[in-house]
Amino acid sequence: MNFFEQQRQARHRTALLVLLMILSVLSLITITCLAFSLDHANDGSRRLTLNWQAVGVVAPLIIGVVLLGSLVKYAELRAGGKVIAEKLGGRLINHGGRTLEEQRLINIVEEMALASGIAVPTVYLLPDEGINAFAAGFTPEDAVIGVTQGAISLLTREELQGVIAHEFSHIYNGDMRLNMHMLAIISGLLVLGLAGSLILVKASQSNHRDQRLKLAGVLIGIFLCIAGFAGSFFGSLIKAAVSRQREFLADATAVQYTRNPQSIAGALKKIGGHAQGSHIKAARAGEFSHLYFNTGVSSAMDRLFATHPDLSERIRRIDAQWDGTFPHVEIPRSQLKRN
């Protein structure tokens, strides 16, 4: 398949998934507002009718809770890529005292900056043995690129070029900002669920004489829990699907930048053949899994919430002739202890 066609398809699928997420969130908020605004009709019948006064009170409250949770997450994520790199144990590669491997990495970053038309970002080195990298930041101006020691020690110059080109694609295509928007929305829904949990606990422990009021509090708490946690669950599923499409887009764009499909294909094959794979050991590695070149952590929910496509599928999209075997990769211990 033509790599420009792959880019077009990935962008189209991303747009559909983002639209689905927006519609899902709006529907969830609308249903929640309506559920709290239903009342019995005044004509003596048992039919339910919509109390518009209640809508005027409930709607701003529900929207306000979701927005508050989203804004708190925004404030946390806007700190820039530097904060994320440091949380993952990254070390800034300074102008002085670079090793030959570090200098080669900086040269490649500068080459890819020129190819993509983006300013040269700050570069961090992670001490991990796994072959991995990431781009983080809210805008190209505060973006950083992080690369593991395993990547710069094990990959050839061409393979490392493919990895860096992939990360520049994420910066160029605005994937960092897109991820931040989705994370903020999901966090807002999660806060709605947490608010429901608090109401449920308080209502169930209440000694109020009016049992109907107590029951109403319990029901409100249960409904908010279901709405918030279900919303964040399905939002996370959509976010993971969007992330997988952006990985395909970044792979295809990396080929465009390097003009060499085997550069990124070779790096992916080495990940498959390396004992450490693309593993990142930092305590908060899972929090930033969607940023990595390849999955950096593993969990029981991998298939459901996978932020990256299957390694073999990514390779076959680039190298249709691949026979399915991974090269055996050994990493010299002496190179891993430089940090």
Region spans (language model):
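Hydrophobic or amphipathic, alpha-helical segments that drive membrane association/targeting
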Residues: M1-F138, N173, L178-R244, F248, ...
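C-terminal capping/extension segments of zinc metalloprotease domains
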Residues: M1-Q9, A252, Q256-G266, K270, ...
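Short pre-active-site segment immediately N-terminal to the catalytic Zn-binding motif
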Residues: I93-L100, Q149-G162
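Active-site recognition of the HExxH zinc-binding catalytic motif
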Residues: V109, V147, G162-H170, G174, ...
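Envelope-exposed proteins and targeting segments
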Residues: P121, E141-A143, E287-S289
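Membrane-embedded alpha-helical segments that form the functional core of polytopic membrane enzymes
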Residues: I145-I152, I226
